[in-house]
Amino acid sequence: MHFAIPLEYQSELEATEPVDVGTDEEIISSIEQYRPVTSEKNIWAFWDSGILSMPSWCKRNVIGWARICGADWTIRVLDMKPNSPNHVLKFIDRDMLPEAFLSGTMDGHHTGQHSADFIRGPLLHHYGGVSMDVGCLLIRHIDRICWDLLADPDSPYEIAVPVLYDQTIANHFIAARKNNIFIEKWHQLFLHLWNGRTHQQGISDSPLLGFIKDIRYDDATDFHWDWSVPVPQFLEYIAQVLCWQRLCLIRDTGDGFKSSEYWQRNVLCIDSLNEVWGGEKTLGFDGIGPRMYNLLTTRLDADPDSTAYKDAYKLVWRLLTRSSFQKVTRAKNLTYTPHLGTLWDQNEGKDCIPGSFGELLRYGPVHFRQKRENIEQLEASEPRTLIEKGLLEV
C-alpha cells in the first residue's frame, strides 16, 4: 500500500525509497549468514534462540533496520544456538563473558535482557558500531542519528547513548567507535559484578554500587512508568546502567583515565524522551501500553472526527517527523500495566494490520525521510559529587 505525506507534514518529511528492496525473507536469510567484520558500521542485536524464533514484530523491526540503513551497515543478530553461524562465541572471547552465561546456568528473571547486556560491551569495544535491542522500531537512519558525528574527526563525540536524566542512560541503543576505553571500563565493571553469580538478585548490595543510595529522582519526573516492583529489584534489572553511572561519577579509574571528564566531553547524549519515547511524550505514560496498542490498530478509514482516529494520527505523525526510533518496551513483570511489546507478543500481527495506523508506522520510516538535520540532544550532566576511588576499588 502507498501512503502520502499530509500537507501539514510536508515541511518536515520528504518521500524517499528503501535502500534495501529485497523481500522480507531475503533480508532475514541474509542476516542469518555469517559475515566477517570488515568495518565499524555494525548493528549488533541478540536473541538467544536465533532470529527465526523472534516474535514477528521484532523481525519486522530488524527488517526495517535493513531497509533504512542499507548495505553500508551489517546487521547481526547473535545467538547461543549450537553450531549457529552467528553464535556469540564466533565474535567474543569466552573470558569476556560471565560463566553463568556461557554454561547456561542463569536462573534469575530477565535472563534474555541480561544476556544481551553481557555481549554489548565486548562487541562495541572490539568492533565498533551500534548495539540495538530488537524492540527498537527504527525511524531515522543511524548515520543521521549519531554515526556521522561519531565518525567526524572534528567532533569530540565517540559514543552516543539515550539519556533520561543526570547520568541515567537507556542501554537499548549504544553507539561507539571501536577500542573505546570508556566502553571497555564499563564492561569490565559489569563483568566483575557478575563474577560467581547466576542471577541479578542482590547485585545492588555491592559496595561498588553504594552510590545508588544517594541517587536523587527529582529529574525523573518526566518518566512515569507504573513500576510494580520495589526500587532495589528495578535497580538490579538495570545493573548495567548502574555501572555506567558509576563510571560517570569516578574522577579517575585508577590508571589515569578520567572517566567522569570523558562522559562530559565525549558522549553524545540523545534526548530519550523526545527521540526514543515519542509515543509516551505524545500520549503520556498512564496506561501507555494498551493505549498505543489500540491506537495502532485503528483503521486509517475510520471516522476522522473520532477521538481514536485523532489520537492515532497525532501519535504516528509525531513519531515519523520527530523521533529517531520508538523503543517498544516489554517491562515484563515490572509494571502494573502491560507494555506494548508484551501485547504484541501476545497478539500476532497486530503491529501492522493492513489499513491501520500500525501499517503506516511500518511504512513511514522506510519511505519518508525527516528533513530536520539534527536530533534533540541533552548536555552531559556534571556529577554533584565525584567518587574518588578506582573502577573496582571499594
From Swiss-Prot:
Family matches, as Gene3D superfamilies: 3.90.550.20
Induction: Expressed during infection of barley and Brachypodium.
Similarity comment: family membership: Belongs to the afumC glycosyltransferase family.
Protein known as: Probable glycosyltransferase FCK3
GO MF: glycosyltransferase activity
Domain of life of the organism encoding this protein: Eukaryota
Record lineage: Eukaryota, Fungi, Dikarya, Ascomycota, Pezizomycotina
EC numbers on record: 2.4.1.-
Its biological purpose: Probable glycosyl transferase; part of the gene cluster that mediates the biosynthesis of cytokinins such as fusatin, fusatinic acids or 8-oxofusatin, known for their growth promoting and anti-senescence activities toward host plants. FCK1 is a bifunctional enzyme that performs the first steps in the biosynthesis of Fusarium cytokinins. It first condenses adenosine monophosphate (AMP) with dimethylallyl diphosphate (DMAPP) to yield isoprenyl adenosine monophosphate. It then catalyzes the removal of the phosphoribose to produce isopentenylaldehyde.
Description of the deletion phenotype: Results in enhanced production of cytokinins, including a compound which could be 8-oxo-trans-zeatin, an obvious intermediate for the parallel biosynthesis of 8-oxo-fusatin.
Pathway(s) served: Secondary metabolite biosynthesis
InterPro entries: AfumC-like_glycosyl_Trfase, Nucleotide-diphossugar_trans
Keyword terms of this UniProt record: Glycosyltransferase, Transferase
